[in-house]
């Protein structure tokens, strides 16, 4: 069944890129969003709690060789990986990868603790630190972009998803499909739509049901700003 989607991307922690490379390439997927918070093996084990850094980096190189467009998502956290902010940008610029810094989100266990305030690293702080090492300028971004974009002349681009500093809820068009088949319309709303029943339908019925499901998911969006949720981000997808 052809869904008629104009754009689709995979969000992944990169652990299975090497193993699933053929399937990814054959699927026609052109874009990958890879979550990677550090280039330090020790910090990687501490933050990710599983997996292997070299496996992720090798997978990234393989996907680049295959011609896929890659964005890397990094969540800067004070007292954790804030010393990786500049090395990560240097790594990405040298490979033609756009790095997206994502402000720490008030979700999961952070929703009801002081850790969010303690670890939060703002867009202003990011730009001040990056400015000590790179010359950059703010650039225009598409209307529905979730990121504030910046250009490093002659080297590439980076972005900041500033959900706290500059909320983008009013222009957000994203829908997220989790690994267990649920579609989420908003990260500030734990409600989801179960897509699995559609998989057993005939094409015409499936297309109609899918359109209705996606419309319901869009109605779950809130436009007044990011308020956070107890749902853990890794179960939804970035």
Please name every model-derived segment.
Residues 19, 23, 50-56, 72-79, ...:
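Noncatalytic linker/hinge segments flanking ATPase motor cores
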Residues 108-225:
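Accessory C-terminal segments flanking Radical SAM cores
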Residues 51, 59, 66, 108, ...:
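Glycine-centered flexibility motif
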Residues 105:
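Short, charge-patterned binding micro-sites
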């Amino acid at each position: 069944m052809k869904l008629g989607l104009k754009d689709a991307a995979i969000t992944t922690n990169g652990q299975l890129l090497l193993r699933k490379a053929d399937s990814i390439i054959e699927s026609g997927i052109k874009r990958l969003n890879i979550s990677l918070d550090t280039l330090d093996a020790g910090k990687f084990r501490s933050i990710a709690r599983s997996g292997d850094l070299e496996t992720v980096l090798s997978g990234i190189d393989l996907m680049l060789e295959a011609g896929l467009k890659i964005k890397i998502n990094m969540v800067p956290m004070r007292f954790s990986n804030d010393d990786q902010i500049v090395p990560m940008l240097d790594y990405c610029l040298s490979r033609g990868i756009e790095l997206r810094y994502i402000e720490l989100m008030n979700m999961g266990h952070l929703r009801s603790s002081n850790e969010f305030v303690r670890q939060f690293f703002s867009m202003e702080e990011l730009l001040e630190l990056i400015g000590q090492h790179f010359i950059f300028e703010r650039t225009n971004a598409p209307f529905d972009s979730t990121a504030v974009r910046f250009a490093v002349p002659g080297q590439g681009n980076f972005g900041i998803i500033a959900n706290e500093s500059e909320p983008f809820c009013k222009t957000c068009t994203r829908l997220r499909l989790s690994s267990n088949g649920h579609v989420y319309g908003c990260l500030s709303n734990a409600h989801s739509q179960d897509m699995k029943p559609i998989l057993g339908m005939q094409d015409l019925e499936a297309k109609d049901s899918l359109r209705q499901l996606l419309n319901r998911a869009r109605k779950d969006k809130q436009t007044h700003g990011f308020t956070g949720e107890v749902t853990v981000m890794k179960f939804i997808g970035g």
